[in-house]
Amino acid sequence: MKIAFLFRTSPHGTSISREGLDAILAATAFCEPNDIGIFFIDDGVLNLIDNQQPEIIQQKDFIRTFKLLDLYDVEQRFICTASLQKFKLDNRELILSCEKIDRSLLLEKLNQAGKLFTF
């Protein structure tokens, strides 16, 4: 993979995660889908929880936009197993399917990327 996008922060309160998603969508215009890898670790896994209500805290609901990754054929998506366990989440609660991997394998894959963008 040439470009890796790492999500480490929660989705609301700042625009960091939304900007990360925008960066991924922009990258799909210039890269082949298999050149892009997306990783969720720590608070970043919270970006994938379905049925969030950010309008309650006057935030924009961008979470559903993650579903566009299927449309753009971005299939290299990984989520940290330990982070899921920390928040007691399972696949049924997530808006996007990702391959569950342990932290060490996730970090190994990140090290193989040509460029790394962290959000």
Curated annotation (Swiss-Prot):
Compartment annotation: Cytoplasm
Keyword Cytoplasm on entry: yes
SUPFAM superfamilies: DsrEFH-like
Main location: cytoplasm
GO CC annotation, single: cytoplasm
Entry keywords, A to Z: Cytoplasm
Purpose of the protein: Could be part of a sulfur-relay system.
Protein name from the UniProt record: Protein TusC homolog
Organism, as annotated: Haemophilus influenzae (strain ATCC 51907 / DSM 11121 / KW20 / Rd)
